[in-house]
Amino acid sequence: MLKLEIKKIKFVNILLVSLIIPLLANAFGLINYLGNKGALTNQWQSLWTQVSLFYFSFFYIPLIAIIIASLWATEHKASLKFIRLSPKKNIDFVIAKLGLAFILVSLCQIYFLGLFYLSGKFIAGFASIDFSIYLYYMILSILLSLPIIGIFGALAIRIRSFGIIVLLSTIFTIFGFATAFKSLKIVGLSFLAIEANNLRYIGINDLALLALFGLGEIIISLYLSDKFLKFENK
């Protein structure tokens, strides 16, 4: 299934989004750091607070939403004909899209971290870096992307407009931060964004809650995706 989904991808559209959004976040963060260099004195840590602020606060959830919506756009252009004629179950297509989107998001995160290192090393002129805490945030951000992929995958089955998907992802980002500032773990990525911006490790209890909410959101989104596909295929 995954190989089949890869063949159907419109790589140009996804590649442009995947390259531009992490680049913009790093550029804004770097410019903000250089403009406030006198007050930001901790080099890598200071640059990270600026870069992660822009990326996780404004860009990451919309990026995920655009990627999964792009994957479903291919099916919508064919009026879901391939899914309708396939002997495979609807949920198989949903899981395949989720898996492919997860791989693409993971690659975006590796690219984002690489840009962070290159900008700090060659533009800001920092010395060597201890990657441990940044890798920790990247791994968590990749894992916590799964619920978002599931949620916007379900929405993308019913909503064909990219504009509406981006708008909903922006509203979802605002909602996530509103809950995260109250220490709620409903939107794991928003909670992670606050912790990452403050360079804090997340406690075991909080990680367990994030996993619990995330698993619940994935299960619900898979169920809704299956129902939405059945409705669309009528």
Model segments located where?
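Signature of the 12-TM Major Facilitator Superfamily
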Residues: 16, 91, 95-96, 166-167
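Short loop-to-helix capping motifs
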Residues: 12-13, 89, 160-162
